[in-house]
Every structure is written in structure tokens, then in C-alpha cells.
């Protein structure tokens, strides 16, 4: 197994997750800001690892496996934390929608890979926009310095949920022929 800079960035993202969770629960006024900062650093590595792997031609099978896993674990844990913090349907509903979509699309990608058609459900531009909206919304909801940032975070969280459903429909449509094939 090769450890290059992109793969190390992905591993760093995974290592940041428990620190992000612990800081989230600390009983200090600075904890939300630092928790959001750790989350943002982890989120930025999600962009950099893929960019550097492509730019430096350092893509590896391990990195291709670990990157989406690290991304989904980071985002799912952040969604669980903000859902717990806010105790409200307007955070829980979009979070549940996005987590369910990730499970559905992960299963679809695995199944399409077994058919040798993984490229038909490759990441699309709408998926990238969705991920950006999720990350920004979650950072704002974790940070929560004032009510306006919280409202903006909740609004963007709903936008991310809509983009999530849109991208899921695109992926299901791309796989429709194989899904409905008898």
C-alpha cells in the first residue's frame, strides 16, 4: 500500500473525527467554534486530497476507497451531532434524508460496480454542489455564534437536502435500465 500526500490527507481527516466529536461536547464557550474549525479543516482535506491525487497522478485504490468513506463518516457524525443539539424536525428531517440517500447511493454504486457499470453512477457536479452545501451548513450549525448563522445554516441544510434528493434521482435514473432489468 502506498502512502502519498493525498492518502495521508484522507487519513488525517479520519483522525480528526474523534477530536471534532470530543470538542463538540466540551462544556466551554469556545467549544462550538473549535469543533466547527476542526470540522472545516477535515472538510477542506476532502477537497485537497482528491485535487492533489489527480494533479500529481497519485491516485491509489486505497485512497479511492478511503476518501468517500472518510467523507461520509465525517458528514454523518456531524449530522448526528447537530441533530442531537437542535432536537428539532427542521434539522432531523434533512439529516435523515441525506443519511438515507448516502446509504442508498452507496449500495447502488456497489451493485453497479458488480455489473461492471460503476462509471454510470460516478460522482456528478450536483453531488459536488450538494457536498459543499452540506459542509458549509454543518459548519454553521456546529459553530452557531448567533441566531442568524443558525438560521442560515438551517436554510442551507434544507438546500443540501433538496440537492441530495435531486442527485439521488439522477443516479437512480442513470441506473434505471439495470435496476428494472429482469
Curated annotation (Swiss-Prot):
Residues 2-12, 82-86, 169-181 are cytoplasmic. One of its GO terms (biological process) is glycerophospholipid biosynthetic process. It is an enzyme of class 2 (transferase). It is a multi-pass membrane protein. Its EC number is 2.7.8.5. It is found in: Cell inner membrane. Pfam families: CDP-OH_P_transf. GO terms for cellular component: plasma membrane. PROSITE patterns: CDP_ALCOHOL_P_TRANSF. The chain crosses the membrane at residues 13-37, 61-81, 87-107, 146-168. Belongs to the CDP-alcohol phosphatidyltransferase class-I family. This is CDP-diacylglycerol--glycerol-3-phosphate 3-phosphatidyltransferase. It comes from Salmonella typhimurium (strain LT2 / SGSC1412 / ATCC 700720).
